[in-house]
A protein has these predicted regions:
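Extended, low-complexity regulatory regions
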Residues: 16-18
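Terminal beta-strand-rich extracellular "head" domains
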Residues: 1-6, 10, 21-103, 107-137
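Short, solvent-exposed loop/turn segments enriched in Ser/Thr/Gly
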Residues: 12-14
């Protein structure tokens, strides 16, 4: 359960993480997240964006294929004019090309906007992160 009490300009790390070691440098990794997100607000629009980072050794990156925020685009967004507290599914998947046979750790992050509270797996939610190696030769 990861949550924050306010809107932010920073990405929040979650406990949703998984590791895989590809068998070939040409392998692709299908990364698939399906989970419950939570947002709460007292007025106006509110939303949440997701991204999955990739760590190989000591280098962490956020591949474009695993990112839902582009300018004002958020993966899960709702509009409301009065107090609201909502939990809903927010899937994210992408095909990564890490070009390595070293261990890779994928980790979910979120960033909320215009909220009093937001999080992943709040309100008894569950999330899954699935990694599948695909032959890239």
């Amino acid at each position: 359960d990861t949550s924050t009490g306010s809107a932010s300009v920073d990405w929040h790390a979650t406990a949703v993480t998984l590791t895989i070691t590809p068998s070939a440098t040409s392998s692709k990794i299908l990364v698939s997240f399906d989970g419950q997100v939570y947002v709460q607000n007292t007025s106006g629009d509110a939303g949440i964006a997701l991204k999955i980072s990739r760590t190989i050794g000591s280098t962490t990156t956020s591949p474009d294929a695993l990112h839902t925020k582009s300018a004002a685009n958020y993966s899960a967004h709702y509009t409301q004019q009065t107090y609201g507290q909502f939990a809903f599914r927010a899937p994210l998947s992408g095909l990564d090309s890490p070009n390595t046979t070293s261990e890779i750790t994928y980790k979910l992050y979120f960033i909320p906007y215009n909220v009093n509270g937001a999080g992943i797996n709040s309100m008894n939610g569950r999330s899954t992160l699935t990694l599948m190696e695909i032959d890239g030769s």
